UniProtKB/Swiss-Prot annotation:
The cysteine framework is IV (CC-C-C-C-C). This is Conotoxin Ac4.2. It comes from Conus achatinus (Little frog cone). Coiled coil: none annotated. The modification Cysteine amide is found at residue 40. Residues 1-11 form a propeptide. Keywords: Amidation, Disulfide bond, Glycoprotein, Hydroxylation, Ion channel impairing toxin, Neurotoxin, Secreted, Toxin.
Length: 41
């Protein structure tokens, strides 16, 4: 999962990465806790 996320994160914006990897349950450099509750504004 790490390699796949790294590749996606490198070529796509963090918003796209969030949409594809629902940071809920995933831990990554572009994953913020508020994304889980969609309170990131």
């Amino acid at each position: 999962f790490d390699g796949r996320n790294a590749a996606v994160n490198e070529r796509a914006p963090w918003m796209v990465v969030t949409a594809t990897t629902n940071c809920c349950g995933y831990t990554g450099p572009a994953c913020h806790p508020c994304l889980c509750t969609q309170s990131c504004g």
